[in-house]
């Protein structure tokens, strides 16, 4: 949050700030912390010592640019160098060298890393904060059982529980529990120290039996008893150093390391003053926790809410990268130890450079970015998607929850989420409530807590002043917080006497004088996606959730358009996404073209490259269009070029189109949408999609594969687009089945397949004749388009043969068509059902045909009335040539503020354009419209307007699929499933019932045999169909039935069937 120099005013923080602040924290603090933990390494004879000098570490600037790293499939990383010393203790000599430890992937200003040419982002994780938590549960008798759970920094748990006899146990697993006296003794306390450090010594003495006294008589006895209980070991184990090490590794390291945050939380909860650098659980902690547990039993103290955000911590990108660095340095330590030992055994003189290898660090980070669940491929469908992806919060991942084990209470909205986690924006399906989104103003504090800003109100010198505070979830419970519906920042302005406020997770109505804090912004509670929905306060939250998800699926259109009705955040979203090109210096434009803009300033000439037809990982087209003219003087920060889905530096995901809410011959039944052919012919909803096809050359046992145009046994028609090297030419139009890259793979043919002249050459001259198999890259079904780019990448490797990858990029122009999905910004989504000629569409009183017809029944039941306000205000804005930016919850200005604004704008539009039908007082917002087929008016007036409608990535071209023949599963011999595998349509149990119900026996038999898994019958069908014969009936069982028989046999069940003769009742047994 940035103050702009005035009291009580502020600007919205950068939306990518949370990511690159975390990365900066890792570089500035985490890197030094982990390097300083690297131990001094000695050989077995203690003659040589290896150590790192952390103060001299250096990160080198990358040698390649981000764009080159993407094109060449490389990692945009920095090399880490550290000074290392090798000390010979006998001669006291030291050799110091600057060594290369490995590559650390860098993050750009947008919070994105590039690993192996792929844009990746690390999302933040919410974990249970380490510390102690008290809870109460009812047992089977209905009696409250109190427990205290100590959670370590690693996620390990140790439970303290008190039973009916007031005995305190430590539960180390679900079945094993041990007396707290034994645990404290095993951790180093004697009985006297225990009784001196507790508030209720008589309770501890009450369950001290003679057997218990023997167990805690000495530390060794206590450790042996604890080891037996913890490891479930029978017999009498003997106390030894190895036993202590095993216990240390299995129990104390996993369950007793609290970390910095855990130590702070336990000190605060148990009123202790143990130093912050003491990060392990102490006997004093255990005894204080037991005291609090006894207090809970007697009704003193408060239980903990596990779902409160004060009991959670955010594991940010800094923590994840620091953990990986620690893991890599531990591996490096083992490598150095092994190398020193090997050098001494072979009597070699080691040097610091010879001892260290860069492999552990480089491979650890590559595997982290490639395999870790919290490192995800950046979704680049549109600019909004890129920003929202980096602001996700996940309960899932290592150390977190899973979609199947998380209960409803964890998924639900909690009052502590206010201003920190968006109550609306979450995923749909099994992960609902487990993946959330940060609120706009939230930030991550020093202790891993989510902080939200508030204005503090206080009086000084009879003058009301305002100051901004960032509060963690544990702090804002103690303040009366006004809920943001009080308008003035200045106390001089008369306020309402009573205002709604929040206090200790309750909503109250209090006098204005009692308010301590107030919200700073109407958007403070929402994420970016939810903040882009106008009139969100008039929508049901479920529909707002759908809308915030669907905006991220909007496809950038070929001709973008600003929304007439917006919320005011569109500009910042576009700027922070990095999609528009922005001037970094002021100067004068020398020239502009589609590839670059040349700018002169401060005596220098700067060339700014523009993105041209770049493919995103969702196959959408990223493209920049210059917005400045030659000779124009520009200032720093001015927009030079608009990107995909931005116009004038504002987010533009869809189009403002004329819509009517009315039924039309059933074509908009169940959310279907009727559209005009104008949207197709006018390229209103046309988008470009770029697909990538690649092929790699390998070295086989018979020799290397070749890229060539000379492909035998293929029609010349398929090879028409290849150049002399065998690669498709730029700009050529390709159809399904065309060869994109010609490739031959060598193989040795059998003796019988040689031609006579080949056999003669082999017999006389001994020449080995090899044949080749064509393994060309062919364009799959649905891939037709224009070749816009070809890249031939040679991978750098240590082998003698470096594989080559050839990538072909093909652009498709897609108009809107039947089956495509469209949506508004209020969760109103639908599939195009029919494209009508413009003359048949309903038309307005001024003769304009509408572009789209929605079903009016989709509004009242879904309770998303915001679309009606947007629709009507959009119509007024288009007639008045105005754009509106409306903050949410405008009802705080006055009652019915939204309706008054819309009606007043419609009335003004009606007056200025001399069109009385725009605002008719009898039915405001509605109008009489006419049937385009007959010219007659419809019976009822209809709501018409101009809402902002998006075209989504779910397009029929990517989904439609058919199969004539293809691959079969090896076991069941049935067709595979799915479009990607060229699979078949499943005929399930209910489909069989439907066919049985209509008595179509032959069709049913075909479905279950020829078209499915009867191997011999389906082979015979082809031949008989070609010659025109009758299709033979299958005599034996299909393969899936045979599979069932085999599975029954594996369970020792034999299945047979018999034929009984009608004449003599002879039984003939037949094999199944």
From Swiss-Prot:
Its main location: plastid. It comes from the Eukaryota. One of its GO terms (biological process) is DNA-templated transcription. It is found in: Plastid, Chloroplast. InterPro entries: DNA-dir_RNA_pol_bsu_ext_1_sf, DNA-dir_RNA_pol_su2, DNA-dir_RNAP_su2_dom, DNA-dir_RNAP_su2_hyb_sf, RNA_pol_bsu_bac, RNA_pol_bsu_CS, RNA_pol_Rpb2_2, RNA_pol_Rpb2_2_sf. CDD domains: RNA_pol_B_RPB2. Keywords: Chloroplast, DNA-directed RNA polymerase, Nucleotidyltransferase, Plastid, Transcription, Transferase. It catalyses: RNA(n) + a ribonucleoside 5'-triphosphate = RNA(n+1) + diphosphate. GO terms for molecular function: DNA binding; DNA-directed RNA polymerase activity; ribonucleoside binding. GO terms for cellular component: chloroplast; DNA-directed RNA polymerase complex; mitochondrion. It holds the Pfam family RNA_pol_Rpb2_6. Signal peptide: none annotated. Belongs to the RNA polymerase beta chain family. NCBIfam families: PRK00405.1. DNA-dependent RNA polymerase catalyzes the transcription of DNA into RNA using the four ribonucleoside triphosphates as substrates. This is DNA-directed RNA polymerase subunit beta. The lineage of its organism: Eukaryota, Viridiplantae, Streptophyta, Embryophyta, Tracheophyta.
